[in-house]
Regions:
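Histidine/acidic-residue-rich, glycine-tolerant segments that coordinate divalent metal ions
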Residues: 59-60, 82-101, 107-108, 114, ...
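Short polar/acidic secondary-structure junctions
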Residues: 65-68, 152-153, 354
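Divalent metal-coordination and catalytic microenvironments
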Residues: 21, 61, 76, 106, ...
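Non-cysteine beta-strand/loop elements that form the S-adenosyl-L-methionine
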Residues: 75-77, 189-191, 348-353
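Conserved acidic residues
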Residues: 48, 158-159, 345
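Acidic/His- and Gly-rich active-site-bordering loop/insert found
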Residues: 1-102, 107, 111-114, 118-126
């Protein structure tokens, strides 16, 4: 167990890259400056091939192993996009763009993978090839799917793929992983309840969509408590309830919206079915109607057992077995690396960000002390998965 000496030696350089990227956040697929910076570094490191424009604005650098060695290609993925949030960290390297910031640590993810790419391109101590993948639009744009659909796996012959995300609250130098589902599917719904408007003093002459909607909100919680197996997680959260315009008027319509998170395909199907039944059934019982718009987004992120073992062993080699939780509870957040794991076997791991603000918080900042651990982890994954 040990950090790679070079990961410590290059920490200042990599921290500089991270802070440069942090100052220049870009959203979804509009990551042209970010992608240009990444591609420039990969060329500077001597990658054998650097391809841009995959999945619209993604970048892939290909690094071949030692001369004369043959073997498969392993993909290592980092995300590039920021979030539409106003930063309040007050850091010297804070966002220069109002309304945009790296509030999920993708700046750190890129920097660590760039550091690993520099080391791998220099040492090439593996048999096969490493594809370092820099993906746009993780934050709601399904950039991972776009890169898969653009033929990335086939173009580079990728046989296994690995992803990593920082986790606030997990101490620096620790890792967390598990086989099977590790992050949830992320679905969204919108429900329009239509009743009959009227005077608030004469509700008997109206059909009140606010009362109807309130009953729907309450009943949706029975999906988790009464419809699903208690051991099969589901979250149904109503996060918007909009309606009405005056204190003495019962409105004609109200609108509800929210999210559903699940960890298995069966529960995902059941949750959607029950949400539709509950909304339309309760509306009908109140004399109203409910129009349900249900959109499926990212699928469940499912780690493959063999690759999970490679990832866990690589983390243990980096930080020590006692610093690796190999049975972490799944997270109910979503992650579009799921699409890459549907296309190829692989694994997704969490790396500790220490005592920082939570992800997507305006006070969040990536912890630069994590950088040597992330670089060392990526190098260990590549060298274990492609043992010479």
């Amino acid at each position: 167990m040990a950090l790679l000496p070079e990961s410590i030696e290059m920490k200042n350089d990599v921290t500089g890259w991270r802070r440069y990227l942090h100052e220049r956040p870009e959203i979804l697929y509009d990551v042209h400056e970010t992608a240009g910076f990444v591609a420039g570094k990969l060329k500077e490191f001597g990658c054998d091939e650097v391809v841009t424009g995959l999945g619209r604005t993604g970048v892939v650098g290909l690094i071949h192993g030692r001369e004369g060695s043959n073997g498969p290609t392993v993909g290592l993925r980092a995300d590039m996009d920021a979030l539409p949030i106003n930063e309040i960290t007050g850091a010297n390297w804070a966002s220069r763009t109002p309304g945009k910031m790296h509030a999920c640590g993708h700046d750190g993810h890129m920097a660590m993978l760039l550091g690993a790419a520099r080391h791998l391109a220099k040492t090439r101590n593996f048999a096969g090839s490493v594809a370092v993948i820099f993906q746009p639009a993780e934050e709601g744009g399904a950039g991972g799917l776009a890169m898969v659909q653009d033929g990335m796996m086939e173009r580079f012959g990728i046989e296994r793929v690995f992803g990593m995300h920082n986790l606030p609250g997990l101490p620096v130098g620790q890792f967390a992983i598990k086989p099977g589902p590790i992050t949830a599917s992320t679905d969204e719904f919108a429900i329009t309840v239509t009743g009959r408007g009227g005077h608030a003093a004469m509700p008997h002459l109206a059909v009140d969509p606010i009362v109807t909607g309130s009953a729907i909100v309450t009943a949706l919680q029975t999906i988790a408590s009464r419809n699903g197996n208690p051991l099969d997680s589901v979250v149904c959260s109503v996060t918007k309830f909009n309606g009405g315009f005056a204190h003495n008027v019962i409105p004609e319509t109200i609108k509800l919206a929210g999210t559903v998170r699940t960890l298995t395909p069966h529960m995902r199907d059941l949750a959607e079915e029950r949400l539709r039944q509950i909304a339309t059934g309760i509306a009908a019982s109140y004399g109203a109607t409910a129009d349900v718009n249900y959109q499926r987004s990212y699928p469940v992120t499912v780690n493959h057992p063999f690759e999970t073992a490679i990832a866990g062993d690589s983390a243990a080699l980096t930080a020590g077995e006692e610093q690796v939780d190999r049975a972490v509870d799944p997270m109910m957040g979503g992650e579009d690396f799921a699409y890459m794991l549907e296309a190829r076997p692989g694994a997704f791991i969490f790396i500790g960000n220490g005592d920082s603000a939570s992800l997507h918080h305006p006070a969040y900042d990536f912890n630069d002390e994590v950088i040597p651990y992330g670089i060392s982890y990526w190098v260990n994954v590549a060298e274990r998965a492609l043992a010479a």
